[in-house]
Each structure stands twice: as C-alpha cells, then as structure tokens.
C-alpha cells in the first residue's frame, strides 16, 4: 500500500471516529407533575443519568423569575404551585434547555 493511501485511510478513520462521537451525546430531559400544592420535576439525561444538584427555575409568562430550586439526590426539584400560569426550565449548560409549561403538568 502506498503512503498516500495509508494517509487517506488514517484521516478517514480519524474523521469517522470524531464525527461518530456526536451520535453518543446525551441531552437533558425533564418531566413534571402536580402533587397537591406542590409541583415536582425530575431532571435527567437521555442516557438515563440523573441531574443531581442542578438549578431548575420557574418563570411567569412575562419572564419574571418566580422561584429557583436545586435538584435533590433523586434529581427532583420541588416548587410551590403558582396561582398564575408559569413555565419551568432546566438548563444543564449544554445542549438546549428543557422547558415544561404549566398546561403540560398533570396530577400524579
């Protein structure tokens, strides 16, 4: 095999490895539910890992911060239920933040 063919194969293999890593990336997920006077949200990642000690924020529809809490050791963030419409955001710092609107939250 000539040196140029080996170089092309080496570059092709390295490119395939680098670009295939993106396939294995994980993205943030969050599911929220209502339990009486509380809203609970479980934050995590698509690979099944938990999001422990991450900030989760609640905003009203005018984008005013209502509350911010940290996820616990179970990846659960707990809020007091707001009388107004709201949305909750989990921003893990990479990929896109996850947003759950109050109309999407049902009783557990």
Kindly give the residue locations of the regions a language model identified.
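C-terminal segment of classical bacterial N-terminal signal peptides
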Residues: 16-24
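Short solvent-exposed capping/turn motifs at the termini of beta-strands
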Residues: 43-47
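Short beta-strand/loop motifs in extracellular/secreted proteins, especially
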Residues: 52-54, 86
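Short amphipathic beta-strand segments in non-cytosolic proteins
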Residues: 55-68
């Amino acid at each position: 095999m000539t040196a140029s063919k080996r170089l092309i194969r080496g570059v092709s293999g390295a490119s395939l490895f680098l670009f295939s890593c993106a396939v294995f990336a994980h993205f943030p997920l969050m599911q929220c539910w209502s339990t009486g006077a509380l809203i609970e949200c479980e934050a995590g990642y698509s690979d099944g890992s938990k999001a422990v000690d991450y900030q989760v924020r609640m905003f009203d529809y005018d984008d005013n911060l209502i509350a911010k809490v940290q996820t616990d050791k179970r990846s659960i963030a707990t809020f007091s239920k707001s009388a107004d419409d709201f949305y909750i955001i989990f921003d893990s710092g990479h990929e896109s933040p996850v947003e759950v609107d109050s109309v999407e939250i049902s009783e557990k």
